[in-house]
Amino acid sequence: MPTLYLIPTPLADGTAPQVLPPTITEVVAATDAYFVENLRTARRFITELKTGRVIDETTIHLLDKDTPQADTRKQIQELMERKRNAGVMSEAGCPGVAAPGAVVVGMAHKLGWKVVPLVGPSSILLALMASGLNGQSFVFHGYLPIDRNDRGRALRFMEKEAQQRLQTQIFMETPYRNNQLMGDIIAQCQPETRMCVVCNITAPDAFVQTKTIREWKSQLPDLHKKPTVFLLL
């Protein structure tokens, strides 16, 4: 049976040599079919690894939140018939974790493929590691509601869960709305609630700090258009 490789990609530009093990390059060199979240970034990543692989001779299928499952099912079945291995890549970080990928992995399991996750950076786990908050019990909520009232209710719910369960609450926002979310957190959460802000993780200008809401209120960072993970406890 073919193998489906789950291939992490860098979180920050120019950091591949620092954050990816040699196995990634070896697998990419030997794999000529991919399911990817973003065609442009995937092609660039494959090229930057300098494996000698010719992009025009590589099969690359788009797999984002809008991709019909019927298309993906047909594509993976065709690869299986030809006994071709495949890789899955998200735009940044680990595929299938807060990123597309789970659909094709589920299909691969049903078809009897071997599924191999490779080691690489995850912004969620790196943020949790760096936060100093509870790493034994935590939950990732993904993106919060856009509507301000709904977002406020979500924040109050997470704060209550954090207090009652002593459970770290992890979430994120589209980078251009980070500052707005930061303001909503300050407005909705209690002064002594702790929050960790992890911004541009693995980049040279990475920012990681854990403070109480009271402390954050006196000095808000500028997170506009910067990939950021938020953690509450």
Name each region found by the language model.
Residues P2-Y5, R84-N85, Q164-L233:
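A contiguous loop/helix-start segment that scaffolds small-molecule binding in enzyme catalytic cores
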Residues D64, T72-W113:
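Glycine/small-residue-rich loop that forms an oxyanion/phosphate-binding "nest" at active or ligand-binding sites
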Residues M1-L63:
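Glycine-rich, flexible N-terminal cofactor/catalytic loop recognition
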Residues V28-Y34, G112-V116, T168-Q169:
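Short active-site oxyanion
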Residues R40-A42, G93-C94, S123, R177:
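Alpha-helix capping/helix-boundary segments
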Residues L11-D13, E91-P95, P175-Y176, A203:
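Short glycine-rich anion-binding loops that position phosphate/pyrophosphate groups of nucleotides
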Residues H61-P68, L144-R148:
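Conserved helicase motor
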Residues Y5, V103-E161:
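Class I SAM-dependent methyltransferase SAM-binding "motif I" and its flanking Rossmann-like core
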